[in-house]
């Protein structure tokens, strides 16, 4: 588990397999700093077309797992046991939402989106296969909306919906996050059916050479902690 496909852009068909640790290290260490700052600058100047052009050429991951030959649903070959909750248009509440999200035990990771106006959450889940995904996504989206008091973008209900890279030096990762299943209301999930599940990939680490610029990926089971940022924000 915890392995995902990284595409150089949304129309690429040849992904690289990385871990969530790798992805969050890239978000933190500035791997996508230049395009992220360019995108945000264009948005601030109301240059929407230029901003979208930058975003369209941005690398993205498939939080649900590993894909082959594209990222359509039928390209998914193994599960990461995580899902993405996309909270958009947070504006002045962005930092507050990020801080509170980092305190949730089932949050595997959190970071400020490429626009700087939203928060991406990766949530740990426990499912047997792709047929279980719609129910747990719907229940988790409702839970997060209730706990954080915000609406979320329903696009992530599609299991292979891509998540763009970003630059956030305070990005949070907790490899020991608990499965959200235990935090959902009774009856939120329907009984599971028996079928041949999509397998979960072995938990190994693939370290891109780009990590040599100052922030190595966390080892499996460790946290990339947002505590310093949280403390400075609350004081």
Which residue ranges define each predicted feature?
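DNA replication initiation on ssDNA origins
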Residues: 1-81, 200, 206, 218
């Amino acid at each position: 588990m915890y392995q995902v496909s990284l595409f150089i852009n949304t129309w690429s068909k040849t992904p690289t397999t990385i871990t969530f640790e790798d992805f969050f290290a890239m978000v933190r260490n500035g791997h996508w700093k230049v395009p992220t700052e360019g995108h945000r600058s264009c948005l601030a100047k109301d240059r929407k077309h230029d901003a979208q052009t930058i975003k369209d050429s941005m690398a993205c991951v498939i939080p649900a797992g590993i894909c082959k030959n594209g990222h359509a649903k039928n390209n998914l070959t193994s599960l990461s046991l995580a899902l993405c909750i996309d909270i958009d248009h947070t504006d002045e509440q962005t930092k507050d939402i990020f801080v509170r999200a980092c305190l949730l035990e089932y949050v595997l990771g959190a970071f400020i989106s490429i626009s700087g106006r939203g928060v991406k959450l990766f949530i740990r889940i426990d499912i047997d296969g792709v047929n279980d995904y719609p129910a747990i996504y719907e229940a988790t989206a409702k839970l997060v909306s209730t706990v954080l008091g915000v609406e979320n973008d329903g696009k992530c209900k599609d299991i292979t919906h891509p998540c763009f890279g970003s630059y956030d030096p305070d990005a949070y990762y907790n490899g020991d996050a608990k499965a959200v299943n235990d935090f959902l209301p009774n009856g939120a999930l329907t009984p599971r059916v028996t079928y041949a599940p999509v397998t979960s990939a072995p938990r190994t680490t693939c370290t891109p050479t780009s990590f040599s610029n100052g922030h190595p990926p966390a080892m499996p089971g460790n946290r990339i902690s947002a505590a310093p940022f949280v403390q400075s924000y609350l004081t």
